[in-house]
């Protein structure tokens, strides 16, 4: 197996390895092409040895490069009351950052 890590960002967890492209919640102060550093590494596997953090693995960092800002699929919320001519339809599209994982430091 190739090395991978489990990181936490935006209150979500992602399993990543080098070269992966993931969509994460928006991060403040990050522009296109800039390096992104994820310091909350919960688990690492280097091909032979696994390290489980309590709650995070010390000295483990995942680095990536921001590729672009993307928008998620539209989520529709529809409310109605029968026989009352009451209909409300709203939509929401979440904004994400597309990040390419460049380096796992374990």
Curated annotation (Swiss-Prot):
Pfam annotation, one family: Ribosomal_L21p
GO MF annotation, one: rRNA binding
InterPro entries associated with the record: bL21-like, bL21-like_sf, Ribosomal_bL21, Ribosomal_bL21_CS
Sorted UniProt keywords: Ribonucleoprotein, Ribosomal protein, RNA-binding, rRNA-binding
GO biological process, one term: translation
Superkingdom per UniProt: Bacteria
One Gene Ontology term, aspect cellular component: ribosome
HAMAP family (alphabetical): Ribosomal_bL21
Similarity comment: family membership: Belongs to the bacterial ribosomal protein bL21 family.
Quaternary assembly: Part of the 50S ribosomal subunit. Contacts protein L20.
Function as written in the Swiss-Prot or TrEMBL entry: This protein binds to 23S rRNA in the presence of protein L20.
The name this protein goes by in its record: Large ribosomal subunit protein bL21
Annotated source species: Chlamydia felis (strain Fe/C-56) (Chlamydophila felis)
């Amino acid at each position: 197996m190739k090395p991978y890590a489990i990181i936490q960002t935006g209150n979500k967890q992602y399993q990543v390895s080098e070269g992966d492209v993931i969509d994460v919640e928006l991060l403040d102060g990050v522009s296109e092409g800039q390096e992104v550093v994820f310091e909350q590494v919960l688990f690492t596997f280097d091909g032979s040895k696994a390290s489980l953090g309590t709650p995070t693995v010390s000295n483990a960092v995942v680095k990536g490069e921001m590729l672009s800002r993307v928008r998620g699929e539209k989520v529709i919320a529809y409310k109605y009351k029968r026989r009352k001519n009451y209909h409300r339809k709203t939509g929401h599209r979440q904004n994400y950052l597309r990040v390419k994982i460049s380096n796992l430091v374990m």
